């Protein structure tokens, strides 16, 4: 059994200076028990902690590492930028044009794009733009969907808020909460009712087309099409939050996979190659309202900085050249089938949701299609499962309500190791 002496020491020290000892709540292991593991190095599909233990990584920095950690082309490009170009200028640079051209080529909905520094900035900016263009105040989001930590989104949110059992946050004003309406995921009638009750007042509907912060819940295609039709009828801006699923479930994201085009798209994670980045883009008629061209203000000191753009450009080029998506889907299917076989052997019938290389094993027998069904999962069983997988050298997200990501660097031997560990961990979780 691996020891974590140094991690425990560092966590005690961190708690003196950092709230909760972590810089993002889900990292704290509160829902799975024990102390967080402090990592020292990542390479390919593996991470090594400060105590020298090595883990097969299925977190992938929470999604960005579709090509694994320390990809040689990305690290070489970053080294060149760091030593030959610079880290930031606060001026326009040619790389901004290069990544914008790539994004408009890859993502069906994007005609113009603005770079920002995080997914949260992207979603906040997209909603502000929708409000500015429509002259309306209210937005509709979906229970359990996570769109970053902007005030408008922390009402029945997913991700760390759901993990900690607090889907609403103190500090969100009553007025902000009143302007954020929550519908049920995959339930068009709940959306239509809110639109009817707030006729002419809905600026935007924002949705993760593959929800990744309530576990993994794919939207039904007919549901997304109904949203598209409703927005067209009512003059509502449809926003796809593809910060997590963009460039992950398909090169052009979920909108390519489903064949349904939103008005605005938010992006992040993969387009930074592991560095902080975000972007929002969409129809030219909307994006031309962003300052300095239009009146909707958005700015950022480090937006479009050379390091983040270097990693993003190189990542996108590799994805375009190599088209790893069929192989990533094969790997995801291998794990899904292996887990299913293990459950059959053990007489278990837990739910698996998967889209390509993005998956979740829910400790419930109820089909998971929304927030309400996701929270039927047994988090105590998941905690035992997580601990057993960790002991066997498999690092999963420390929450029942997060995704499991497979990368191009996971080998067949890695996948077989994971399936074997899953069998042991399922026994530990259910005994």
Swiss-Prot record:
Subunit relationships: Homodimer.
PROSITE patterns: AA_TRANSFER_CLASS_3
Pathway noted in the entry: Porphyrin-containing compound metabolism; protoporphyrin-IX biosynthesis; 5-aminolevulinate from L-glutamyl-tRNA(Glu): step 2/2; Porphyrin-containing compound metabolism; chlorophyll biosynthesis
Recorded catalytic activity of this chain's protein: (S)-4-amino-5-oxopentanoate = 5-aminolevulinate
Lineage: Bacteria, Pseudomonadati, Chlorobiota, Chlorobiia, Chlorobiales
Keywords: Chlorophyll biosynthesis, Cytoplasm, Isomerase, Porphyrin biosynthesis, Pyridoxal phosphate
Major localisation: cytoplasm
Record organism: Chlorobium luteolum (strain DSM 273 / BCRC 81028 / 2530)
Protein name, entry field: Glutamate-1-semialdehyde 2,1-aminomutase
Gene from which this protein is expressed: hemL
Enzyme class: isomerase
UniProt GO molecular function: glutamate-1-semialdehyde 2,1-aminomutase activity; pyridoxal phosphate binding; transaminase activity
Sites bearing N6-(pyridoxal phosphate)lysine, chain numbering: 269
Gene Ontology CC: one annotated term: cytoplasm
Enzyme nomenclature, EC number: 5.4.3.8
Cofactor: pyridoxal 5'-phosphate
Compartments it resides in: Cytoplasm
Sequence similarity: Belongs to the class-III pyridoxal-phosphate-dependent aminotransferase family. HemL subfamily.
Record-linked InterPro entries: 4pyrrol_synth_GluAld_NH2Trfase, Aminotrans_3, Aminotrans_3_PPA_site, PyrdxlP-dep_Trfase, PyrdxlP-dep_Trfase_major, PyrdxlP-dep_Trfase_small
Biological process annotations from GO: chlorophyll biosynthetic process; protoporphyrinogen IX biosynthetic process
């Amino acid at each position: 059994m691996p020891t974590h002496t140094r991690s425990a020491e560092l966590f005690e020290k961190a708690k003196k200076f950092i709230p909760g000892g972590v810089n993002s709540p889900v990292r704290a292991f509160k829902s799975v028990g024990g102390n967080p593991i402090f990592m020292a190095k990542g390479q390919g599909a593996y991470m090594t902690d400060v105590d020298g233990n090595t883990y097969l990584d299925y977190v992938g920095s929470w999604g960005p590492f579709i090509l694994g950690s320390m990809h040689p082309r990305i690290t070489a490009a970053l080294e060149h930028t760091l030593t030959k170009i610079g880290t930031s200028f606060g001026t326009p640079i040619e790389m901004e044009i290069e990544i914008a051209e790539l994004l408009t080529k890859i993502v069906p909905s994007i005609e113009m794009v603005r770079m920002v520094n995080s997914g949260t900035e992207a979603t906040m900016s997209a909603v502000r733009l929708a409000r500015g263009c429509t002259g309306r105040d209210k937005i509709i989001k979906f229970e359990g969907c996570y769109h970053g930590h902007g005030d408008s989104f922390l009402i029945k949110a997913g991700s760390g808020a759901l993990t900690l059992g607090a889907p609403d946050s103190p500090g969100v004003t009553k007025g902000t909460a009143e302007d954020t309406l929550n519908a049920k995921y995959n339930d068009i009638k709940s959306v239509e009712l809110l639109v009817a009750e707030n006729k002419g007042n809905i600026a935007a509907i924002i949705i993760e087309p593959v929800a990744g912060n309530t576990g993994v819940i794919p939207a039904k295609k007919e549901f997304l099409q109904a949203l598209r039709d409703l927005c067209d009828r009512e003059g509502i801006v449809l926003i796809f939050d593809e910060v997590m699923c963009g460039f992950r479930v398909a090169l052009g994201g979920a909108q390519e996979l489903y064949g349904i085009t939103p008005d605005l798209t938010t992006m992040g994670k993969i387009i930074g190659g592991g560095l902080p980045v975000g972007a929002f883009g969409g129809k030219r008629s909307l994006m031309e309202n962003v300052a300095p061209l239009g009146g909707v203000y958005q700015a950022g000191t480090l937006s479009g900085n050379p390091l983040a753009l270097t990693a993003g450009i190189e990542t996108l080029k590799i994805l375009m050249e190599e088209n790893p998506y069929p192989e990533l889907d094969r790997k995801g299917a291998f794990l899904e089938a292996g887990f299913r076989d293990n459950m059959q052997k053990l007489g278990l019938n837990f739910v698996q949701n998967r889209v390509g290389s993005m998956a979740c094993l829910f400790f419930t027998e109820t089909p998971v299609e929304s927030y309400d069904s996701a929270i039927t999962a047994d988090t105590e069983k998941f905690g035992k499962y997580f601990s057993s997988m960790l002991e066997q050298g498999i690092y999963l997200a420390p929450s029942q309500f997060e995704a499991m990501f497979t990368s191009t660097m996971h080998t067949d031997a890695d996948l077989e190791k994971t399936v074997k560990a899953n069998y042991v961990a399922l026994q530990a979780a259910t005994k």
